[in-house]
Structure formats: structure tokens, C-alpha cells
Amino acid sequence: MSSRLPIGVVLGSVGVDVRWWLDSARRLDAAGYAGVWSWDHFVSRGVRTDPVLEAWTTLTAAAMATERVTVGTFVANVMNRHPAVLARMAAMLQEASGGRLVLGIGIGGHPAEHEAYGIDFPPAPERARHLEEAVTVIRALWTGGPVTRPSDLYPLRDAYAYPVPNPAPPILIGAGTPAGVRLAARIGDGWAAEDDTFERLVPLYGEALDAAGRERAGQRVVLGFGGRRKRGADPLAAEPLLVAPREELARWRDLGADDLLLTARTTDDVDALVDAAERW
């Protein structure tokens, strides 16, 4: 790849081991991809005994194993961790990575996982309330504190949080519904979108930014492809973004995306990505 294109890769974290994940991250970094991203799950939706990599420890190891790529969550589940703890984890990863973290965060969507782990999973509107307050808590703690705020969800009292991340990581709101997109426009530094809903929702995102009095130029829209593609399905080598990346990138940018993410679940997928980068 002659120069880094804004194309990153979500590396599957289900049914793989951490050595594969880190080796893949190193290969993609060397090939010139812009970032490596992780899902945030604890349990497989398929075979329950499949290994599932924890997102934040995996990304921290990846930051140590790479030199240039962004590391990010696509996306963290707000219900999985108290936002004060998440703020501290993200701040440390931002420092460890030399400022390469992007925090994507959303309301989650795997209720069986929550039931298995005893983690609350209220209805979507209530999870959205958790998300909005969590973003407020995270940003407040990233100032270093002290932070005191009464709350029925996440109260804080004289909370300090050092070291302060500098710069603070951008926070992308994962959303695939109209309500989620409106929330992303109102509180996010950008929107983490998926290809199956993006074209339908992107006009609403622009309208919601206008309604919130926010400029589109200050936002980052990251669009993920293939998140629902089954492991071992159609080969990634046939993905249009790999065949004609600049043309496809221009097309999706015209539609409103800034960065594009492909999903790789297997060594064959990573091989296809590396081979494609050598041709560009």
C-alpha cells in the first residue's frame, strides 16, 4: 500500500486465540491498514465453548505489538463495565498506544450473554440512558477530576482520574436505529455505523446534527462492512473495497462515510487483505 488509506479491519474475536489476533494485527499494520478494531463480547452466539477474546486486554496487547494502526472498539457495550472503570481503562490504553485509541460504544445487543453473566440488560431506551450518562462520566473523568455528580445510575464523589489522556480519545456512538443515530449526533464525536443500515440512516444523521447545532466537519463517521457475514462465507478477496479500494472509498465518502472497516475472521481473510494491499 503506497499510502495509508482510511480502511481499517475489525478482527473477529470469537473462535480465535490471542496469538492469531496479535499476529494478524501486526500483519495488517505492516501492510498499511489504518486500524485494527475489536468487538466486545464475552460469549459466542454460536458454539458456547468457542473461545472469545476480551476486547480491552486484547487491544492493549495489540497496541504493544503494533506501531502505527489505530486500535478501537467496534463497539464496546456500555452495560459491560461501569463507565468510571471504562474511562480509566481507555485512558491507560490511550497512553500505552501513544494516542492511537478510538472508543466506539453502544447499547449492546446480545441479551443471552447478559443473562449468562448476570449483567443487567434493560430495554433499549433505558440502555440508551445508560449510554448517554456513561459518555458524560467518561469525559468528566478524562479531565482528571475531582468529579462529583449525583446520579441514580453512576454517582461519583471526589473522583480523580490520572493520568489524563492527552489527547482524549474520540468517542463514536454505535447506532443502527433512528433513536441511536439521533443520540450519536447529539453526544458523540462521531458515529460507528454498519453497512446494512447506513444508507437508510445517514440522511437522518445529518438532520440530527443540524438540530443539535453541530457541524458535520467535526464528526467522524466510521462504517463497518461484513459484521454479519458468517465465518467461512464468501471469501473476503471478492469484497469490492479490496478490488477497487479508491473507487469504493470515494463512493462511500460521497454517501457520508469518513473511514471504512472490513471484517476479518480467518487467516484466509487476513491473507486476502495483505495481498490486496500489495496491489494498491
Predicted region positions:
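Active-site-adjacent structural elements that line small-molecule/cofactor binding pockets in enzymes
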Residues: 1-280
